[in-house]
């Protein structure tokens, strides 16, 4: 990606109080997954995988906040969209109108789509495998100035993750006891009990 654009993206993300990363297809190149995990962990950047087509980040990663962006978008002040054609549904999800939005990907604006109307303050064209490394390096050069902000955000995210885990366990326990009908979380829980490390899950919908 263009170095000047990468620097601008780094500045946006490092100055943000409530940044968010949204992706769907980045994991098509498996080499990008550890790069995103490294970036998110280092700078306490929460990640939403919205309607994912691939594994983009480990489900138990401390910065993986789930699959729905709606609860986060009203408060975000910066969004990094990585290899994602539809990062949210405008009629359902309300983005903070003052948020800066950066799109990153080989075709960040999906120019072949007849209609696509998402805000964009900066478009970075390039492979996510290359651009994520560039972005981490650019953000690292600003790291000392944002340490307190990043540390505070990390603590807040850890608390939210703990609450998410407790709610998920409560829901699964309720279903297991027969007090509630099974849902997607229950199916995922059951699959997780039987799958092996090298198993491949295919979702057809």
Where in this protein do the model-derived segments appear?
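A general structural motif
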Residues: 1-10, 182-183, 205
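Anionic-ligand anchoring segments at beta-strand to alpha-helix junctions in alpha/beta enzyme folds, i.e.
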Residues: 8-79, 193-205
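Glycine-rich, acidic loop regions that bind phosphate or pyrophosphate groups
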Residues: 49-160
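Generic amphipathic alpha-helical segments used as scaffolds and interaction surfaces in large
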Residues: 23, 27-30, 122, 126, ...
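Active-site diphosphate/adenylate-binding microenvironment
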Residues: 158-205
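Conserved phosphate-coordination/catalytic loops
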Residues: 3-4, 63, 67, 126, ...
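Well-ordered alpha-helical segments embedded in enzymatic catalytic cores
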Residues: 4-8, 131, 186-190
């Amino acid at each position: 990606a263009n170095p000047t654009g990468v620097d601008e993206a780094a500045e946006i993300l490092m100055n943000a109080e409530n940044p968010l990363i949204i992706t769907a297809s980045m994991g098509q190149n498996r080499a990008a997954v550890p790069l995103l995990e490294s970036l998110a962990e280092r700078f306490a950047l929460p990640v939403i995988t919205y309607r994912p087509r691939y594994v983009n980040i480990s489900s138990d990663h401390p910065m993986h906040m789930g699959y729905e962006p709606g609860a986060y978008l009203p408060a975000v002040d910066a969004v990094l969209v990585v290899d994602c054609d539809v990062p949210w549904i405008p009629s359902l999800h309300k983005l903070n109108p003052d948020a800066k939005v950066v799109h990153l990907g080989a075709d960040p604006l999906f120019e072949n789509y007849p209609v696509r109307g998402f805000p964009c303050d900066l478009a970075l064209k390039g492979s996510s495998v290359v651009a994520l490394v560039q972005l981490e390096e650019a953000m690292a050069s600003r790291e000392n100035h944002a340490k307190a902000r990043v540390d505070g955000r990390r603590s807040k995210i850890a608390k939210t993750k703990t609450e998410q885990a407790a709610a998920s366990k409560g829901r699964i326990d309720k279903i297991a006891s027969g007090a509630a009908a099974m849902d997607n979380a229950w199916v995922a829980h059951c699959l997780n009990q039987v799958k092996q490390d090298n198993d491949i899950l295919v979702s057809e919908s």
